[in-house]
Amino acid sequence: MRKILFILLIITMAGCSSKKKDLFEVIIYECEQKEESLNLQFEFKGEVELPLEKICDSYKLLQDSIISVMFGEELVDYPTKKALRVYADSSFAEYKKVYEEIFDNAQCTMHDAQLYNYETDIKGKILFYDSNVLSYQRELYTYAGGAHGMTTKTNYVFDIKTGKILTEEDVFGKGFERKITKQLIEKANILRAKGELPEEDELYNSWNIIPNGNFALTDSSVIYTFNPYEIAPYYYGIINIELKLEN
């Protein structure tokens, strides 16, 4: 038997100024699905912030690009609330398939097992925009049993007129790697001195700290995001290194 409970909310952002109501909307979808015959429980929460027409004339291109990086290119043509629902359903189906295979390989019955909980929480938000670019962040939390879940953050910089994802080379020009790497290592050493990064060893050291494509722009800086295990053990969390654009 499969039980589904879902809540769908469409919220227009209300900020300090009434203008924000016309600039962005936030669409939230929550569902809980149970497959009692398999002893499975799945919880999903999705939240996506989208620009509206007053941001720019090409807002639809931006929306399509955001939906593509959030949920997959195949869901771009879906209404946003349906894209969230389809993404949730496919996540549950994939989770269920994995556990069916586990139990088949273990040669035990589903009723012999404990209740397996799986959680997915995906959130997309606008970090910054101006007349040229829009910085966006996709945050994904998953829990599939074990000691803890995993959160990752992925940043995207879009050309606000075309919806195209901009690369580091698009923003900084050719040959950016050496200069950006030098600045990242300098900032990382400051974090290390504060205890916010581990002391260097064979696994985590300056060789790991390079431009990784996971960057966002603000009006005065570029922020590089390093997810757990990239440059530090899990318990250090997500590391952001901010570089001033003037440099």
Model-inferred region functions:
Residues 8-9, 230:
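Exposed boundary/loop context
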Residues 9-10, 24:
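Residue-level signal for mature regions of secreted extracellular proteins and peptides
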Residues 12-15:
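C-terminal motif of bacterial Sec signal peptides marking the signal peptidase cleavage site
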